[in-house]
Amino acid sequence: MPSTPLSATVEALSEDAAQARHAELSRAIERANQLYYNEDAPELTDAEYDALRQELEAIEARFPALTGTTEASAGVGAKPSEKFAKVRHAVPMLSLGNAFADEDVDEFVARVRRFLNLPAEEAVAFTAEPKIDGLSLSLRYEAGRLVTAATRGDGEVGENVTANALTVDDIPETLSGEGIPEVLEVRGEIYLSHEDFAAINARQEAAGKPLFANPRNAAAGSLRQLDPAITASRPLRFFAYAWGEVSEPFTDTQSAVLERFRGWGLPVNPRTKLCRSAEEMIAHYRAIEAERAGLGYDIDGVVYKVDDLGFQRRLGFVSRAPRWALAHKFAAQEAITELLAIDINVGRTGSLNPLARLKPVTVGGVVVSNATLHNEGYVQGVGADGEPIREGRDIRVGDTVIVVRAGDVIPKVRDVVIEKRPADAVPYVFPDTCPACGSRAVRELNPRTKKLDAIRRCTGGLICPAQGVERLKHFVSRNGLDLEGFGQTYIEVLFEAGLVKQPADLFRLEFEPLKAAIVARREALSAQRRTEGEPAPKKPTKKKGEEEDKAIKNLLASLDARRTIPLNRFLFALGIPQIGESTAKALAKRFPDMPALMAALAAATREQAGRDWLELSALPRIGPGTRDRLFETLDPLPGEAMQDLSLGARLRGRLTPSQREAVLAHYGSEAEADAALERAASQRPGDAYRLFADDGEIGPVATDSLIQFFSEPHNDAAVRALLEEVGTEPLAATTSAAAFAGKTVVFTGSLEKMTRSEAKATAERLGAKVSGSVSAKTDLVVAGPGAGSKLKDAEKHGVKVVSEDDWLAMLAEA
């Protein structure tokens, strides 16, 4: 069965489901950005990351109110690290749109021509240059001298790495030549050659240090060193390809800019070509692809840019990318080798991640000995949608496998050479307990597909050491307990020192052990740097020590200030799957405190619905209402008594023709459908379960997740231990104002005096409902600059429209 197109999947989402999926995608993208840009340790392939981005943008296209409400939606890259001073880019460093097929390039050229409204006889020139797989860097020159070097960061704010950039031979400290603008921001890429990368890893291995996974990670890690001497010891290279702020125009085409750069002493890629058609662009792409292995450095595609800068200005930008540029990505590189073993790593969110141990093989110039196998379903030959992949071929130890490096970053096993499978190879059996903590590992019901998730997860939650640090970071985060001063570093220090293993431990901290852990971490880092031949950090001065003591006391004070917590924040902070902020708030509306909620959940657990009941509820044209009416009585109805029918057949006969069609399509035959209906009849949930599951703001998926979480004894014990240290309080009552209570409000355009999430929260606090679309039921539209189709919809339906200032004035009167 073909997979459902993305557009159809998004079209089927309700507003609440879209908001939940948008939040889920945003979290995944933000984590991927953090790993890629700040930790130089990406987990996703380019294709996997692009798929997340495409789905996020599709949801935002249908629900525009969600645009800009998360970091993933509003920006590119990741927040800059706390290790470096911040630099705000005068002109944001944006990302590029992607092309994966020749047809995408044809469409790009056609789209540019349509936007510019050019006659058929007028040609448009494009530059085509290799896309370097490195770290983006912005160099600010004033009066020809380098004054600041900054990483991309989140696109708006980057990290100040000036001292490190000055050690890179390719980066001139002073530009030379004629016509240099007074202010010139040069954008480019830091990278390592294959030869230099191999030499660095050889030195790492000789020193007993971890090897870098690839040249991109090594280049990024080298540039983002606190000690410039380390950066200077690594032979980093640089290519310039773009610009940010300039004090005055200095040419009128992209190709001329690159020539100027070259003349001023900045290195530019020699394989850049000027093309005048999509055919020429694709031909150059093919030529560079053929040369790729011999270039001596990593590239992952070709970037096309409209050459005429006047055209570039007219084309402008859309979302996070320019309309006038496109990145044409290369297909993955492949090799064949033997699968020696399958190891299981436990991820930071509890996922059991299979890792292939391979007979070493060279893929794209890099020796690969490990590769991802994604998840249990992938190993079994089943996709995320439950449909077969690789024609159903599973992956077994001893198999000959095809390994790919997608995007020149993460190797993965793509397929099995089934003809070479050993006779004694047996299917791999995934563990059903967590190798890190021994808790049950389960596959959850996917709320979108209504099928078992492809990923098996540890249920140990709060006590699993593999998840511990990330769970604790989530617990103290701004949307959790919002513990002031408790950054990621403190959590890592406390966890490694054994002082904090679960949330309750935070509230048992004392001054002396906390200080000792911080001092021990500092001394360990000093010893490590001395071992590596690097200068150790200076010992803190008396004044610095006093400031450190004060900071520790402030941490303890912030903990004491959180010993009474709103129930919704407490629930969200626990990090229970499927319990986001909205669901946590819904639960907090219905229960006064945590003990009351836990008692209700215990009763719900005893009356939980069975699998067939839940599966039936999710079928098209059935739903909870039809299901409940269907099972109101199991006794024969008038007209059924005279027929010698089984219970399942009687129940099937009560369905409408379209409902019967849906049931038969799902179960495959009347016999299977009747058997499932009979099983469902015996699996009906009790009232205690339905109190949660039938609630529109909670639902069966979140209910089952809550039950599963608290059914794990370790989690139940951890929450009870936490409740000995803190108390929960009811959700603050909604403040209703006559102007807003029960009203439906829509925000459109840019809000300049508050974020969209702030505006939404304020409206909801005053008793209003915030919607993503305008209809006849909408009461008020708040329109900022750039408002589009929603204004027309408001006029069509006669809905009142106010400005952001009007809205703020209304709030002041409420």
Curated annotation (Swiss-Prot):
Every BRCT domain range: 735-814
Catalytic activity, EC: 6.5.1.2
Keywords on record: DNA damage, DNA repair, DNA replication, Ligase, Magnesium, Manganese, Metal-binding, NAD, Zinc
Residues annotated to bind Zn(2+): C434, C437, C458, C464
The keyword Ligase belongs to this UniProt entry's keyword annotation: yes
GO BP annotations, alphabetical order: DNA repair; DNA replication
Stored NCBIfam families: dnlj, PRK07956.1
One Pfam short name: DNA_ligase_ZBD
PANTHER family, per the entry: CHROMOSOME TRANSMISSION FIDELITY FACTOR 18 (PTHR23389), DNA LIGASE (PTHR23389:SF9)
Protein name: DNA ligase
Cofactor(s) needed for function: Mg(2+); Mn(2+)
Domain of life of the organism encoding this protein: Bacteria
GO molecular function, one term: metal ion binding
SMART domains with a match to the protein in the record: BRCT, LIGANc
Single GO cellular component term: cytosol
Family label: Belongs to the NAD-dependent DNA ligase family. LigA subfamily.
Catalytic activity entry: NAD(+) + (deoxyribonucleotide)n-3'-hydroxyl + 5'-phospho-(deoxyribonucleotide)m = (deoxyribonucleotide)n+m + AMP + beta-nicotinamide D-nucleotide
